[in-house]
Amino acid sequence: MSIKINHELPIPEVLKNEYPLSNEQKSIKQQRDKEIRRIFTGESDKFVVLVGPCSADNEDTVCEYVNRLKKVSDKVSDKLMIIPRVYTNKPRTTGDGYKGMLHQPDPDKAPDLLAGIIAIRKMHIRVLQETGLSSADEMLYPENRSYLDDILSYEAIGARSVENQQHRLTASGMDIPVGMKNPTSGDLSVMLNSVIAAQHPHHFIYRGCDVETSGNPLAHTILRGGVDKYGQTIPNYHYEDLIRLYDLYSKKDLQNPAVIVDVNHSNSGKQYKEQIRIVSEVLHSRNYNPDVRKLVKGVMIESYLLEGRQDISDHMTPGCSITDPCLGWEDTERLLYDIAEKC
C-alpha cells in the first residue's frame, strides 16, 4: 500500500479527559449555545458576526485577537452575537500549502497530527477560558470534530466539502448551528440539498460505529460567492441574490430558514478591504426588506490583528495571516461598531 501508518492517535474521549472543560466553561458554552440557537430559530433578533483570521496559526496571537474581540462584544452584546472564527484546518485548492494548526502546530515545522489535535483543543479551550466566547471552526474532516464537539458553538462546511455525504450526515447529528456553504461553482441547489440532508435523520458509519442521528434543525446556508468556468468570481451577496435564496427556501420544506453571508472569498474576490463595503450592502438589504431581514442571520468576516497576508518564512510578523488576506484590527473594530449601529 502507498499509505504508511506513522502512529495511532488517541480517541476523542482520551483527549477530552486529558484536556477537559471546567464546569464553569461548560456552563458558559451551554448558555452561549442557547442564545445562538434562539437567533437561528427566530426567537432573538440579534445579529450573528462570525469573525476571525482565515487560519488560526498561533495560539498566542489568536487569543490576543479574541481578547480584543471580547471587549467589543461586551459593548454591543445587546445587538450582536459575536462568535470568534478559530479555524484550525484549511482546505487547499490544489492540496498544497499550509493546512492549518491541526496539521502543523508550528508552520515552520513538519506536519505532526498528534501534536496538532492537542494544540487545537488547548487553543479552543484557552479562548473560552480567557474570554467566555465559545468559537466556530470548519468541519473539514468529519471524524475529527469529535475532538472539539464539546467546545464549539458553530461549525461550517466549506465549498469543497458541501457535496460530500459524510459531511452532510455528520452535520445531521450536531446539536449546534452548522452552515453549508455554496460550492465553488456557486450552485445554490447543491447548498440547499446539503441543508435538506443535514436536517433529516440518518443511519451510517461514524468513527467505526453504527450510528443514528435525529437531524439538525439549525442547519442553514452560507453564501460565499462562486467562480465561473472562466475562473471569474461570481458574487452572491447582492439584494437580488438574497431574494432569490429567499424564494428557493420558500419552495422547500425546511426548518428555520437562514443564511450567513461570507463577505470574503469569492464575494470579495479576496480583496479583503471590500468586506467593509459588502457588509454595509448586506445590512442595507436587510433593512430594506423584512423578508431578507428575517432570512439573513449574520455575516462572516476574515480579520486578524494586522491587515493583509504574508508568506511563511523565518521572520513572520505575528498576527498577520499566512493564508488569505484579512482586515486589520482597527478596521475590524470600526466595522463591528458600525454593524451594531445599523443592524
Q: Where are the model-predicted features located?
A:
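N-terminal beta-rich core of secreted/periplasmic extracellular enzymes
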Residues: 25-42, 72-83, 89, 120
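Internal helix-turn-beta structural module
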Residues: 304-343
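Conserved phosphate/anionic-ligand binding catalytic regions in large, soluble enzymes, centered on
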Residues: 48-61, 324
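Conserved, mostly hydrophobic/aromatic
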Residues: 52, 261, 328
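N- or domain-start disorder-to-order transition segments that initiate the globular core
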Residues: 1-41
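Acidic (Asp/Glu)-rich catalytic clusters
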Residues: 40-43, 70-77, 125-130, 213, ...
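Active-site-facing alpha/beta catalytic cores
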Residues: 66, 79-244, 265-266, 270, ...
